[in-house]
Design a protein with these regions (language model features):
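C-terminal beta-signal and adjacent terminal beta-strands/loops
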Residues: 570, 622, 677-693, 707-711, ...
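Outer membrane beta-barrel strand-and-loop segments of large Gram-negative receptors
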Residues: 401-407, 452-458, 463, 539, ...
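Periplasm-facing N-terminal accessory domains of Gram-negative outer-membrane beta-barrel systems
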Residues: 17-127, 134, 470, 475
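Structural signature of Gram-negative outer-membrane beta-barrels, strongest in the C-terminal barrel
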Residues: 324, 399, 409-417, 423, ...
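Periplasmic N-terminal accessory/gating domains of Gram-negative outer-membrane beta-barrel systems
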Residues: 88, 93-110, 117-230, 240-249, ...
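Gram-negative outer-membrane beta-barrel transporters
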Residues: 473, 566-568, 594-685
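Transmembrane beta-barrel wall of Gram-negative outer-membrane proteins
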Residues: 260-284, 296-330, 348-375, 410-416
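Surface-exposed extracellular loop regions of Gram-negative outer-membrane beta-barrel proteins
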Residues: 194, 198-199, 329, 430-442, ...
Length: 772
């Protein structure tokens, strides 16, 4: 395999002259940039702004709708600068200009006092102020930063995992560990639709999985807030990831054919009349071919489809519709004894799912109102069999939920911004049919407690918020908010969550930030059916957070940020059969070693805390051909279960570090590398003898750690530019040093001993993308 990929690298290198050639694109190759300028908060069009391409003699002005078109732009990755009297100038980089189709961008301009010193008003690559909903601990990545991430395998969640304070559970999954919290504590919002899980083969009751179902080519921006977010975002205690998908291009019909790390697909997009656009994408995996070639006895397969339509009938109204449909399954080859033994330790997470939403955005005289009607639906077919093909776990369930939310932003005058809104969620289709063998579900004394449940119910809840932000002085910004959540399915529980934040600009390049608040989260629906009393014992759990930080700009395209944080958990789900532990599902847990999916007696009595410090530095791509970022996090996480003893959290990783360095020498080539390191996660050793051999020994809960995680990734992109077509080839080497990081040991039923569990090591992939 290594020989094949070495040959591929050589072929790419020989396809063009040396990298050190002049940084000028193919002669005569040009493209178009189209976009829209809006005013921050009000989202009204910005008319008459000058938009120019940095380093090229191409410029234009925005029209009465705030739209602009830049033609004759040399192909490659470019930066535009936007200036308008009364607004802070903005630069927007990483715009990929192609001869095949227009690059569509959106730029938000912030009003300023025209009397401010001119020397302090300069174009910057980073927002001067954070949004009230994400005042601290937030990193935003544009489309190109997400796409080109080394080792991400074109997965948006792996791409944003480089943010400070964020880790992953293992190399083969994208579950996000944010400041010591469990993956189920993370919120995901796609085009204003809250989605329980955006992954193929997603973990039921949690948020992670092996591969995202959101196509990375449609990402306009991806923001991850690691904590301290405002009152608009709720029902999660750790983080919020907000994905904004771009519109289809409005110039002409265009398409793409692509092959990526694990799938191939096609895209078509273009205008629908004068005021509308669309895109449609279908993808199918070829993992079945890879797994068969590598000799695996279990063969995963998935496919998905994405469609989005945007219609702007007037200057004040915009409608958008998004839908993503996906399905995934795993087939097993049980023709050999070794295959049956291997398959007996693999959970089959078959899933069919979709989410969709219709959004209406209306510009008001001094603000904007947004209403979204959405639905999420997933059908799970989770199963596991032992080496004799006897069922161990069989869980078939459906979770369907309808959502209606309205958000209003209003400029009240005198520097005051008001944000308010409400969200109703009605889970109209909750059905669970689960069977769990007794030997996999033992109580604290080791007695088998088999489970058989067949039930259905509905759930209604509401969250309403109000937040006021005051620009008290040109350099001081204060925000106070509150959120009230009602959970009809949890005995009509009501929870009140205050939030506060402050931002002080000490000088033109230095800003101090502070945020704090209370955050509540409802237990996952499947946890309620793990025991007849769970619905009575479980209640919303909480996290009180405080974050303080300082951010300094070192030039217009370099940012350095230092933050300290603390979290204190209460009413966290504790495990009655495992009194030492709190609930912390993290993926395809082997049902033969511990109880899966939270199908066990739980109660809201656990507590916990997490503290840490993070250092983050980022350089955007600009005049220099280099870009990169570096983050280092120190963290300590502890939880206390029913037994009253504080122990390491399941996702306690004291040291996490990420580094990315990229070089774009010309319009054809790009080379980037990523270094990742983290303290190994805790694990619980196995009982090694007796009738309980092969089960986890919770008397030694999380007393061991796997080895330090280290990985280095490399990505090389090559663009081939033709008259009306662009072809992009890339080579992505995940863990190119072939280091086999250790994961938690697995139990070998043949030897009745714990085996080491190394990761796959080097994972190379080639990607091809044809734009036409």
């Amino acid at each position: 395999m290594l020989g094949v990929f070495a040959t591929s690298i050589a072929a790419m290198l020989l396809a063009t002259p040396a990298l050190a050639q002049d940084r000028v694109p193919v002669a005569g190759a040009t493209g178009t940039i189209t976009g829209r300028l809006t005013e921050a908060l009000k989202e009204t069009p910005v008319v008459g702004a000058v938009v120019r391409v940095v380093g090229q003699e191409v410029a234009t002005q925005s029209d009465s709708s705030g739209r602009f078109t830049l033609r004759g732009v040399r192909v490659g990755i470019v930066t535009i600068e936007v200036r308008r009297l009364g607004f802070a100038p903005v630069t927007k980089g990483n715009i990929a200009v192609s001869p095949a189709k227009p690059a569509e961008v959106s730029v938000v301009l912030r009003p300023i006092d025209v009397q401010l010193d001119a020397v302090t008003v300069r174009p910057e690559a980073f927002p001067a102020q954070m949004a009230a909903s994400t005042p601290v601990s937030t990193q935003t990545y544009d489309a190109e930063e997400v796409r080109r991430q080394p080792g991400a395998q074109e997965d948006v969640l792996r791409a944003v995992s480089i943010a400070p304070g964020v880790g992953v559970t293992s190399g083969g999954r994208n579950d996000l560990i944010v400041r010591g919290g469990a993956p189920f504590e993370n919120l995901f919002v796609v085009d204003n639709i809250e989605v329980p899980n955006i992954n193929h083969f997603g973990s039921q009751g949690s948020t992670g999985g092996p591969v995202s179902l959101v196509n990375i080519r449609f990402i306009e921006s991806a923001s991850l807030s690691a904590g301290g977010f405002g009152a608009r975002l709720g029902d999660r205690t750790s983080s919020a990831t907000i994905l904004t998908l771009r519109e289809g291009n409005r110039e002409r019909i265009a398409g793409e054919l692509n092959v990526a790390a694990t799938q191939y697909g096609a895209v078509i997009e273009g205008p629908l009349g004068k005021n509308a656009s669309f895109f449609v994408n279908v993808r199918k995996s070829y993992l079945d071919l890879l797994f068969k070639a590598l000799g695996f006895s279990f063969i995963p397969s998935y496919e998905d489809a994405t469609a989005k339509v945007v219609w702007r009938p007037t200057k004040r109204d915009a409608f958008s519709f998004l839908t993503i449909v996906a399905r995934g399954s795993i087939s097993f080859d049980n023709s050999t004894d070794s295959g049956r033994v291997t398959n007996s330790q693999v959970v089959n997470p078959g899933q069919d799912q979709y989410f969709s939403g219709l959004t209406w955005k209306r510009l008001l005289s001094r603000g904007v109102a947004t209403t979204t009607l959405g639905r999420t639906w997933t059908r799970y077919a989770t199963s596991q069999r032992d080496s004799l093909l006897v069922p161990v776990l069989d869980s078939r369930s459906t979770e369907g939920e309808n959502t209606l939310r309205t958000d209003i932003t209003w400029l009240a005058g005198r520097g005051v911004e008001i944000e308010t809104g409400t969200i109703f969620k009605y889970a109209s289709d909750l059905r669970y049919d689960a069977t769990l063998a007794g030997f996999t579900r033992r109580d604290a004394r080791g007695n088998p407690q088999p489970l058989r449940v067949d039930t259905s119910f509905t759930a209604l809840r509401n969250g309403t918020y109000l937040q006021a932000t005051w620009q008290a002085q040109p350099r001081l910004r204060l925000s106070v908010g509150a959120r009230n959540d009602w959970y009809g399915f949890l005995d009509n529980a009501v929870r009140f969550s205050p939030r506060v934040s402050a931002s002080l600009r000490v000088d033109p390049v230095t800003t101090l930030t502070l945020a704090g608040g209370r955050y509540y989260q409802a237990p996952s629906y499947i946890w309620l059916v793990g025991d007849p009393q769970n619905a009575e014992r479980l209640k919303p759990f909480r996290a009180d957070q405080a974050v303080a930080g300082v951010t300094r700009l070192v030039g217009s395209d370099i940012k350095v940020q230092l933050e300290v944080y603390g979290k204190r958990y209460g009413d966290y789900p504790a495990r009655r059969f495992r009194p030492q532990a709190v609930l912390s599902p993290s993926g395809f847990d082997d049902a033969t070693t511990d109880i899966p999916l939270g199908l066990e007696p739980l109660e809201s009595t656990a507590t916990g805390n997490a503290f840490g410090i993070e250092l983050f530095a980022q350089k955007k791509f600009g005049a220099s051909p280099f870009y990169g970022q570096l983050s280092t996090s120190l963290n300590r996480t502890r939880f206390t279960g029913i037994n009253g003893t504080a122990t390491r959290g399941a996702f306690d990783s004291p040291v996490t570090a990420n580094g990315v360095l990229g070089w774009r020498p010309n319009s054809k080539w790009e080379i980037a590398t990523r270094l990742r390191g983290a303290t190994g996660l805790p694990f619980t050793p196995f009982v090694s003898a007796g009738s309980l051999a092969g089960t986890l020994d919770f008397t030694r809960y999380n007393t061991e750690r796997v080895g330090t995680f280290l990985a280095a990734d490399l990505r090389v992109d090559r663009r081939f530019i033709m008259r009306r077509t662009q072809f992009i080839a890339f080579l992505d080497l995940q863990n190119f040093t072939n280091r086999q990081n250790q994961q938690a040991p697995v139990w070998n039923p043949r030897t009745r001993m714990a085996d080491t569990n190394p990761s796959i090591g080097l994972f190379p992939s080639i990607g091809l993308n044809l734009e036409f």
